[in-house]
Structures are given as structure tokens and as C-alpha cells.
Amino acid sequence: MTAANQNYGTGRRKSSSARVFIKPGNGNITINQRSLEVYFGRETARMIVRQPLELVELTDKLDLYITVKGGGISGQAGAIRHGITRALIEYDETLRPALRAAGFVTRDARRVERKKVGLHKARRRPQYSKR
């Protein structure tokens, strides 16, 4: 892949990170050498990935080459969405306000809360016995 007419964006969510390359094309989305439909079985994950492209109406005009690692399905889909958004902003800065209004530009900083000593989970306490 040549660097001449392509744009790049890095996306992160939870423990996933995605590298997204966009270039003019006809709407092919390749994730880790597999198509979007093969990589994500869940329709919700596919929908999350397509959101920024549908918002700016460039679904059929750009080809996406994506590598993603770490985390699960939801985290990877969110990381890809963040990466696509950053790549689109690099491609055309005038898209930023629309993407910002939709909330795609901001990195979702939520992480898994650590388990505390004396508790079952992060906040789940042992059952309280009055007597």
C-alpha cells in the first residue's frame, strides 16, 4: 500500500487499539485480512464500525484497511470507529464538526474498575448479616 493518497488514524477503546488506513475506492472494509462481515459476527459491532462513514456519507467512496488487536468484540468495534473518525478528519478537516457532534472524536476513557480486597468484585460486597 502506498502512502501517496491514503490517510491514517489510530483508535483506542478499553484494551483494544486499531490502525485505520483510508484511501479512495468503492467501500471495501478489510479488518485483519478479513471482510467486515466475516470478522464481526454481531450486527451491532458492524453498525458501530460503519457509523462515522454513514454520518459523512462516504460509505461507497472510500476503501478501509484496518488492523486491530487486543480486547473483545465491543472494544475492537469502538477502537475501529475511533480510528476511522481520526482518519476521516485527516482526510477532510471540514468533517470534524459533524463527527464531534455525533460524539465520535472523543476517546471513550472508561476502563474496567479494579477488584478491591475484601469485596467479591470491584463494588460487589459480601452479603451483610445483621445477626
UniProtKB/Swiss-Prot annotation:
UniProt KW keywords: Ribonucleoprotein, Ribosomal protein
Pfam families, alphabetized: Ribosomal_S9
Stored InterPro entries: Ribosomal_Su5_D2-typ_SF, Ribosomal_uS9, Ribosomal_uS9_bac/plastid, Ribosomal_uS9_CS, Ribsml_uS5_D2-typ_fold_subgr
An example Gene Ontology CC term for this record: cytosolic small ribosomal subunit
Chain ranges passing through the membrane: none
Recorded GO MF terms: RNA binding; structural constituent of ribosome
Gene Ontology BP, a term: translation
The organism's place on the tree of life at top rank: Bacteria
UniProt family annotation: Belongs to the universal ribosomal protein uS9 family.
NCBIfam families the UniProt entry points to: PRK00132.1 (NF001099)
Name of protein: Small ribosomal subunit protein uS9
Species, as recorded: Glaesserella parasuis serovar 5 (strain SH0165)
